[in-house]
């Protein structure tokens, strides 16, 4: 939340495409003076005007929502990205199933989106990125919502994780966190729950990859998450 406090840090990354969770609606950003974020090509979905999923395009890129769109998949946004290198994007701020043990019977919105948007995903190179709110460390035997169930589905579609392709680390053994939970301390509970998946052919073309540092994003109070930045 409070994207207006983070805009300068975000724009300093000079992104072509930015996927931002817990993001205010663009008209609210405009009222707060965030002209760079409110005047660019952008999309937003959510039920709380101050806390949704935003996609912002810069540097000659534009974004348009793919139709048909299924807003009940909270919050999964299918996006056509046009520009110097067009591609499809599934922007993610996954609101995973709850209710304790009953989760074993629920697939969750992100996994369901792979079926709902399969034609879209298959229509061209597709990047799937954002806050997945999941990791192999929480998987339970036979549960449909498992993180690895989603990873395996995407693997069958020729789509893999950029972080794991670059680092060689196994799923569930990530050494670099993306989320500093609760007390936002570098030695507190930390997790790797933000991911960018891309076509395997693109993973071979990664020119630059980074995970934001604690000091730049969390230690100074900007966020409890750090960004993943990729240049293909």
Per-segment meaning from a language model:
Residues 17, 21-97:
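Structured beta-strand-rich core segments of catalytic domains in phosphoester-bond hydrolases
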Residues 48-64, 82, 173-174, 180-205, ...:
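Conserved beta strand-loop-helix elements of the APE1-like EEP
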Residues 65-67, 93-111, 136-141:
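Surface-exposed cleft-lining segments at the edges of enzyme active sites
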Residues 217-232:
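Surface polyanion/phosphate-binding segment centered on an Asp-His-Pro turn
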């Amino acid at each position: 939340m409070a994207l207006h406090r983070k805009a300068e840090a975000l724009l300093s990354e000079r992104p072509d495409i930015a996927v931002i969770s817990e993001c205010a609606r663009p008209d609210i950003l405009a009222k707060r003076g965030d002209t760079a974020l409110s005047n660019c090509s952008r999309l937003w979905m959510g039920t709380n005007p101050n806390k949704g999923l935003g996609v912002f395009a810069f540097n000659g890129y534009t974004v348009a929502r793919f139709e048909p769109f299924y807003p009940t998949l909270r919050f999964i946004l299918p996006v056509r990205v046009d520009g110097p290198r067009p591609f499809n994007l599934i922007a993610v701020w996954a609101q995973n199933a709850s209710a304790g043990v009953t989760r074993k019977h629920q697939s969750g919105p992100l996994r369901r989106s792979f079926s709902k948007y399969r034609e879209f995903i298959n229509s061209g190179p597709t990047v799937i990125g954002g806050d997945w709110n999941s990791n192999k460390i929480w998987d339970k035997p036979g549960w449909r919502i498992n993180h690895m169930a989603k990873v395996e589905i995407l693997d069958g579609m020729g789509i893999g994780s950029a972080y794991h392709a670059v680092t060689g680390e196994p799923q569930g053994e990530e050494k670099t966190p993306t989320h500093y939970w609760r007390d936002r301390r570098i030695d507190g509970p930390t997790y790797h729950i933000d991911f960018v998946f891309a076509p395997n052919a693109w993973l071979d073309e990664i020119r630059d990859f980074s995970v934001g540092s604690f000091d730049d994003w969390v230690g100074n109070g900007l966020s409890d998450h750090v960004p993943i930045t990729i240049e293909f």
